[in-house]
Regions:
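Charged, low-complexity
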Residues: 1-42, 89-93, 100, 111-112
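Conserved P-loop NTPase motor "coupling/switch" region that bridges the ATPase
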Residues: 68, 112, 129-174
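Conserved helix-turn-beta segment of the N-terminal RecA-like "Helicase ATP-binding" lobe
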Residues: 65, 78-96, 167-171
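Walker B catalytic acidic pair
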Residues: 116-117
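Conserved Walker A/P-loop ATP-binding site and its immediately adjacent core
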Residues: 53-58, 67-88, 152-159
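Pre-Walker A (Motif I) flank of P-loop NTPase domains
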Residues: 39-44, 69, 142-143
Length: 174
């Protein structure tokens, strides 16, 4: 099914409301939430330390409020505690997946897929990249948001192709 209208998603994001721990989203994070909510597939490539995790979670929360979806987060195991803490501030309970154990398909029902350290999928021949692409293309995935501070880890444009494929970008079709 189609995603709710952008205006409805922005209202559900409640961007001015403090988080449960008292923090507020910063202006660039609020802009990032609006940007993600306008896209079914996106690469959020803010620099390290700007709060990509919180931005993606706030956008996912809006989507979860407006549609019957679940939140799947792919992240290195070492970052799972960070994801849990940030999710708690938004009263979310994402299903955390490791890069080493991606499922063949998402759980039943619609899902938002957030992928942290997405540059791990820059080698189109790697098994983890293939597993991510299979998961991202599944019909139950309603949105795919990739997070990385280094979209071109080694400066080779060909490394962007798997990321573009995962989000369904038109450049990846050719």
């Amino acid at each position: 099914p189609p995603l709710p209208a952008h205006r409805e998603l922005i209202a559900a994001a409640d961007l001015q409301q403090p988080l449960s721990d008292g923090r507020q989203l910063l202006a660039h994070q609020r802009a990032g939430v609006r940007w993600l909510l306008a896209r079914r597939g996106a690469v959020l490539a803010d620099e390290m330390g700007l709060g990509k995790t919180l931005t993606a979670l706030a956008a996912a929360r809006a989507l979860l409020r407006c549609s019957a979806t679940r939140l799947l987060v792919v992240a290195p195991v070492g970052l799972h505690d960070h994801w849990r803490r940030e999710a708690l501030a938004l009263q979310l309970s994402p299903e955390l997946l490791s890069w080493a154990r991606l499922p063949q398909e998402p759980p039943d029902g619609g899902c938002v897929l957030v992928v942290d350290e997405a540059h791990f999928a820059q080698n189109s021949q790697a098994k983890r990249t293939q597993a991510l692409l299979r998961l991202a293309r599944h019909p139950r995935i309603r949105a795919v948001w990739l997070l990385t501070g280094t979209p071109l880890k080694n400066g080779r444009p060909v490394q962007l192709l798997p990321l573009l494929m995962a989000i369904g970008h038109p450049l990846a079709r050719d």
